[in-house]
From Swiss-Prot:
The lineage of its organism: Bacteria, Bacillati, Cyanobacteriota, Cyanophyceae, Synechococcales. This is Adenine phosphoribosyltransferase. It holds the Pfam family Pribosyltran. GO terms for cellular component: cytoplasm. The gene is apt. Homodimer. Keywords: Cytoplasm, Glycosyltransferase, Purine salvage, Transferase.
């Protein structure tokens, strides 16, 4: 199944010059969404994660569906101030500024094997920071999975060396 048929291109969103790859038609289509999750399940069969970690916010959609299908737990990586209780955080730089991501301090304290997921790998800044946060929190990063990768933006190069990456749809 060609998953690209379910991705809508939105020019000039969120600002002029940007071509946004919208996965909401994919989420709406039961057959397309099922195919996404089954392909990611196959990835997990190779990498054998104990937990799925998803990056805010569309990584929650991908990650919870995958975790449910696998019978695994799910852990969210969130923007600052969104998680109650004790957190571990990481600050990272963006093209035009900086940001912070957080995870519960005890979420990975038992050193599980983790698959990090999100809907999109673009420049790699958020994914790279999330990967570092997984390690900082005690997890062993066994792989990264994305629905879409914008290869022209070279985000894959920012991810930890030696960690396998699987993207279901690659543009550029």
């Amino acid at each position: 199944m060609d998953l690209r048929q379910y991705v809508r291109d939105i020019p000039d969103f969120p600002k002029p010059g940007i071509l946004f790859r919208d996965i909401t038609p994919l989420l709406r289509d039961p057959a397309g969404w099922h195919e996404v999750i089954q392909r990611l399940v196959a990835v997990c069969d190779r990498w054998q994660p104990d937990l799925i970690v998803g990056i805010e916010s569309r990584g929650f959609i991908v990650g919870t569906a995958l975790a449910t299908q696998l019978g695994k737990g799910f852990v969210p990586v969130r923007k600052p101030g969104k998680l109650p209780g004790e957190v571990i955080g990481i600050d990272y730089t963006l093209e035009y500024g900086s940001d912070r991501l957080e995870i519960h301090a005890d979420a990975l304290s038992d050193h599980p094997k983790v698959l990090l997921v999100d809907d999109l790998l673009a420049t790699g800044g958020t994914a790279s920071a999330s990967a570092e946060l997984v390690t900082k929190a005690g997890g062993e990063l066994v792989g990264c999975g994305f629905v879409i990768e914008l290869a022209d933006l070279a985000g894959r190069a920012k991810l930890p060396e030696g960690v396998p990456v699987e993207s279901l749809i690659i543009y550029g």
